[in-house]
């Protein structure tokens, strides 16, 4: 989800002092949509002043059921359960490579928690012996802050796509969005039409039929 690779030239010398060049594959993290949103959300959280709400960060997933959600989300699935304060109920541990990468991203973006923020986060997890806030900053664990919103769309009528199991479904709030007539910036109805052979049909009437 986060890695890609590229070639890097490594120069070495043999016993005669002659330079030898060897091409090696070097793996490195390349931030994708989730990690970008994750770092931004914590940055906004850390920037919020005491008593104010942090700026909201949104991660938009279009047509979520076009892929296998269990495979796509992996361990992140556990982060979707939120507690009463909007944080993840459960955190997950990052492996050493991801831990170092997240820590560096936080450093690069100036993400650090004030005493107020640290206490606020730790208060959400009173049973933890170590500071959860500091473990988040170190990259050791991942958990979603209360200003990170994940919104997804899906077409429930399309049976050709991947089914979503009930355990995944219950971790979301669902809202039905019906098809509505298109309108321009002034609110006037867009009278779209489609052509088939020599005839034209009203687009909205076509949608209602199917």
Where are these regions (language model features)?
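C-terminal regulatory/interaction module of P-loop NTP-utilizing enzymes
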Residues: 1-210
């Amino acid at each position: 989800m986060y890695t890609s690779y590229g070639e890097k030239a490594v120069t070495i010398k043999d016993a005669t002092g002659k330079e030898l060049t060897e091409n090696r594959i070097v793996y490195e993290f390349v931030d994708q949509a989730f990690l970008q949103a994750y770092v931004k959300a914590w940055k906004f959280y850390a920037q919020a002043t005491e008593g104010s709400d942090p700026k909201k960060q949104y991660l938009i997933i279009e047509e979520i059921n076009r892929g296998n959600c269990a495979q796509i989300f992996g361990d992140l699935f556990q982060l979707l359960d939120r507690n009463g304060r909007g944080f993840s109920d459960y955190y997950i541990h990052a492996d050493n490579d991801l831990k170092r990468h997240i820590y560096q991203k936080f450093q690069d973006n100036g993400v650090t928690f004030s005493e107020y923020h640290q206490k606020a986060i730790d208060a959400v997890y009173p049973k933890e012996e170590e500071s959860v806030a500091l473990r988040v900053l170190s990259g050791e664990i991942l958990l979603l802050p209360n200003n990170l919103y994940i919104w997804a769309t899906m077409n429930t009528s399309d049976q050709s796509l991947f089914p979503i199991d009930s355990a995944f479904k219950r971790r979301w709030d669902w809202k039905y969005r019906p098809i509505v007539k298109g309108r321009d910036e002034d609110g006037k109805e867009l009278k779209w039409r489609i052509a088939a052979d020599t005839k034209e049909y009203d687009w909205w009437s076509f949608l209602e039929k199917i």
